[in-house]
Amino acid sequence: MKKVYLLLLTMFLILGTNESMAQSKKYSVYGVGFYNLENLFDTCHDAGKNDYEYLPDGTNKWTGLKYTHKLRNMSRVLSEMGTDKLPKIGCAAIGVSEVENAKCLEDLCNQEPLKARNFQFVHIEGPDQRGVDCALLYNPALFKVRDYKLVPYIYRLPQDSMRATRGFLVVSGTMADEHVTIIVCHLPSRGATSFYREEGGAQIKVVKDSLIADDPNVKLLVMGDMNDDPQDASMAKCLGAKRKIKDVGDGDMYNPWWDVLASGTGTLMYDGAWNLFDQIILSPSLLNRDNSKDYSTLKLFSHQIFRRDYLFQKEGKYKGNTLRTQAGGVWLDGYSDHLPTVVYLIKEQK
């Protein structure tokens, strides 16, 4: 099976536009994505969690039928992510947020589109009061997990001493025979002030700096629902995620989504305007900062917002918005209020 995947991953690309440069080379391409699943809850109460609205007798009347449909819809999207460039293969790894527990992830990975690729998951139960966590789904033929941990989000203000929220899931593994680490996060919502997201950005930077200090060559991706746009202080200042590759210093990161938002599109819509909260941010080790086309090690090749017609409302007041699972107390049998994002990493085959 592994040989089949590696064969399918081979791409023949022409680098450069000059005839003198037009040499066919062999490359392996890997998709890495992120998707906010928007409340993937099962129908059972988790002790100590405020999940009552997602019970059969809760405000959302969350029945087995609705849960089954949610699993089907999420697996469809997840299985299609990355297939624009990697047909029938999709992503090697996908970070997800707003999932209740390991049972939901097990049920999700047992859906046929994901089960066919033997998708596995990494999850650690977190302290969020609603019970929503982050996780990493991965195809073990393309990404091999070494170890993982959950780094807590730390509330520093005295008045927040009793609060707890989602931490930062850090997963280290091997992709293309290289050390790759993925940090999956879901920063505090916009119901809180920007201070808490700025704290989150600064805390991610501490984790990131520690990982790079341990291995300066690690290929590191920070991904998640940041509840902020690329230009906001949590990302641009506190995390140090730059808009242009030429401005990325050794201690910085690169945020390719800044220009995507500036072009007029995003991953979720609010009051008729796009935001781009769902970001995948890359360490300098994944960049060709000298404008070369050196792909002897894993490098960023391209990035995209994953869009399909079925992810959008087709009519009514909210035409053009994402088709949610439910809205205004009405079950829409949709997907999520967010769109997924994908980056493609490329490496020359020797």
Where are these regions (language model features)?
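N-terminal, active-site-proximal structural segment of metallo-dependent hydrolase catalytic domains
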Residues: 21-112, 122-134, 202, 308, ...
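Bacterial Sec-dependent N-terminal signal peptides
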Residues: 1-27
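Structured beta-strand-rich core segments of catalytic domains in phosphoester-bond hydrolases
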Residues: 93-95, 99-179
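Metal-dependent phosphoester-hydrolase catalytic domains
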Residues: 22-24, 209-220, 228-350
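A long, amphipathic alpha-helix that forms part
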Residues: 194-216
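Beta-strand-turn-beta hairpins that frame and shape the catalytic cleft
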Residues: 24-32, 41, 142-144, 163-186, ...
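Active-site-proximal beta-strand/loop segments in catalytic clefts of secreted hydrolases
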Residues: 35-38, 97-100, 123-127, 139-140, ...
